[in-house]
């Protein structure tokens, strides 16, 4: 089968995946990167790449998520953003209930930020997060624990 036929065969499945999951993926990448342009570019490029690869991709949903986060990480590095990147603009921050929390999440180290966003914002299970990040469940749990501790230290304990 030539590559054109592979793309045509995969297209309906990828279109269905896009309709079902692209908005949630965009929100997760945006929460990670803090930049709506990076999020839009990363999601669009990830779906374009999975379409080009066609049936060669074993798990398109996981592949798209992993690729979108890799693209966003590359874009952040290219822009030389550091851990103290600014909070999202107010018009985009309105989609999140707690602007201070999102600002604090953006200041977490990359591994902790990715784990926290994928677990709490994208509502993904730990095993899937590990697969997306190319790590194991123990590392994800450790990053979640450290991330929560940093957030608690920064924001205080609001439970009591």
Could you describe each region identified by the protein language model?
Residues 2-27, 37, 55, 113:
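A short, charge-rich alpha-helical start-of-domain segment used by transcription regulators
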Residues 59, 69, 133-156:
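DNA-recognition helix of helix-turn-helix
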Residues 2-6, 13, 132, 149-160:
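C-terminal edge and immediately downstream basic/flexible tail or linker adjoining helix-turn-helix-like DNA-binding
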Residues 115-119:
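A short pre-motif secondary-structure segment
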Residues 25, 29, 39-50, 67-68, ...:
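Short, small-hydrophobic-rich alpha-helical interface motif
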Residues 106, 110, 122-139:
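Helix-turn-helix DNA-binding module
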Residues 2, 8-12, 16, 78-106:
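Acidic, proline/glycine-rich intrinsically disordered inter-domain spacer in sigma factors
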